[in-house]
Amino acid sequence: MAQVLTQFDTIAAISTPIGEGGISIVRLSGEDAVAIANKLFKGADLTQVPSHTIHYGHIVDPKTKDVVDETMVSVLRAPKTFTREDMVEINCHGGMIVTNDILQLLLANGARMADPGEFTKRAFMNGRIDLTQAESVMDIVRAKTDKSRQVAMTQLAGGLLDKIRTMRQELLDTMAHEEVNIDYPEYDMDDLTSQEMKKKAEEVSKQIDQLLKTAQEGKIIRNGLATAIVGRPNVGKSSLLNYLTQDDKAIVTDIAGTTRDTLEEYVSVKGVPLKLIDTAGIHHTEDKVEKIGVERSKKAIAEADLVLLLLDASQDLTDEDKNLLNLTANKKRIIILNKQDLGTKISQEMIREITDNPIIVTSILKQENMAALENAIEQLFFSGIENSQNQILVTNQRQAGLLAKAKQSLEDVVNGIDDAMPLDLVQIDLKNAWDTLGEITGESAPDELITQLFSQFCLGK
């Protein structure tokens, strides 16, 4: 864990969204947090109250003596706080003016405006959390479904941290054993030590493999299942988007080519996080703007985790339909036969001869059989991840990339031993793997990485 650092100044920020609301919270952290808040607070003497208590009073401008707001103030003393520093949280009435006035008074009386993510960064620097837990804090804030929140909570509880630390300890024990052999060569334990190193490298590599297998699942749960809504013009793509989002996010008309670009929307369908992409109709066109939309649609299909392919069941299968069936043949997809209320010229049996993908017959405008579509999405998504609530998942590209890098170093260890390389050289690769795993938790992460990571957080967090 990172070194405990205590020589920080005192920071302040608004921790709740700016705007009208019932309550806003202005947060302080640092050695002088209580003293600064006490300059403004008229009620109890905050410097004398017990830790983890809340007090009623008023925030008063020390210079003008004007009462700014009626508040409840929480005093939280180190080390049992989020940042492991003294903290104060001022609960005031929601509203842009009053909240900002309180913040400005805190800044005028000795606090500094917090950088984005600085509260969480201090929690990391003071050993309260590691980098995987810090990332999970933002995952909780940004969670779009219960599933993504549950996975983030598992990370915050230290699931991935414990796994990484166990692997690092195993590698450290192996390196320590090898150091004895290097320091005392008279015992001639090279063969024994090399086999031990190889075995341990292979064991840890397998553990990393198991984590890497969860990376795609973790990405989907964290970011949403990238779902492309695909079909030729005027088959009901935008109507499907509007049904799933329960909002008119796309223009629905009878004019072919109305959607000229890709539209994105996040929704939860029966607990499945979907990042919906309503694509432009893929068809031949001479319109330059439409051509751009068509190319973007093809790119969206290539990058999609799931394709919802719409066909107009009331019309014969067209060449454009056949092209889309071929274009999406290798994707996980659901075939939707829309407009069945207008007649049926494309049957399930006809499509079944082409593919074994799930087929849903519906009228989206009349919302007929839409529950079957939602059930099909749920079944496809949860078929292999029913236990992900308590499962340790790799949830972002940073973690996955470092795991892959560590695995490569371990493979270099195995190859080096097989090629009879000197053990002191092989151990360099073993230490590289150990260091790389430490970057995941922050135990060996460079300062610039830590700064960059926390800069992505919101103010007040």
UniProtKB/Swiss-Prot annotation:
> Under the GO molecular function aspect, what terms does this record hold?
GTP binding; GTPase activity; metal ion binding
The scientific name of the source species is Lactobacillus johnsonii (strain CNCM I-12250 / La1 / NCC 533)
An example Gene Ontology cellular component term from the record? cytosol
Function noted in UniProt: Exhibits a very high intrinsic GTPase hydrolysis rate. Involved in the addition of a carboxymethylaminomethyl (cmnm) group at the wobble position (U34) of certain tRNAs, forming tRNA-cmnm(5)s(2)U34.
Q: What is its EC number?
A: 3.6.-.-
Q: Which UniProt keywords apply?
A: Cytoplasm, GTP-binding, Hydrolase, Magnesium, Metal-binding, Nucleotide-binding, Potassium, tRNA processing
Give the main localization category.
Answer: cytoplasm
Q: Which protein family is it in?
A: Belongs to the TRAFAC class TrmE-Era-EngA-EngB-Septin-like GTPase superfamily. TrmE GTPase family.
What positions does the entry give for GTP binding? 234-239, 253-259, 278-281
Cofactors demanded by this protein: K(+)
Annotated Mg(2+) binding sites = 238, 259
Give yes or no: UniProt keyword Metal-binding: yes
Residue positions annotated to bind K(+) are 234, 253, 255, 258
TrmE-type G domain boundaries = 224-382
User: Whom does it interact with, and what assembly results?
Assistant: Homodimer. Heterotetramer of two MnmE and two MnmG subunits.
Q: Which InterPro entries match?
A: G_TrmE, GTP-bd, GTP-bd_TrmE_N, GTPase_MnmE, MnmE_dom2, MnmE_helical, P-loop_NTPase, Small_GTP-bd
Bound how, and how many: what does the cofactor note say? Binds 1 potassium ion per subunit.
Keyword Ubl conjugation part of the UniProt annotation: no
Q: Where in the cell is it found?
A: Cytoplasm
Q: Enumerate the Gene3D superfamilies for this protein.
A: P-loop containing nucleotide triphosphate hydrolases (3.40.50.300), Probable tRNA modification gtpase trme, domain 1 (3.30.1360.120), tRNA modification GTPase MnmE domain 2 (1.20.120.430)
What the entry lists under SUPFAM superfamilies is as follows: P-loop containing nucleoside triphosphate hydrolases
Q: Name one GO biological process term.
A: tRNA methylation
Tell me the residue numbers annotated for binding (6S)-5-formyl-5,6,7,8-tetrahydrofolate: 27, 89, 128, 461
Write the protein's name. tRNA modification GTPase MnmE
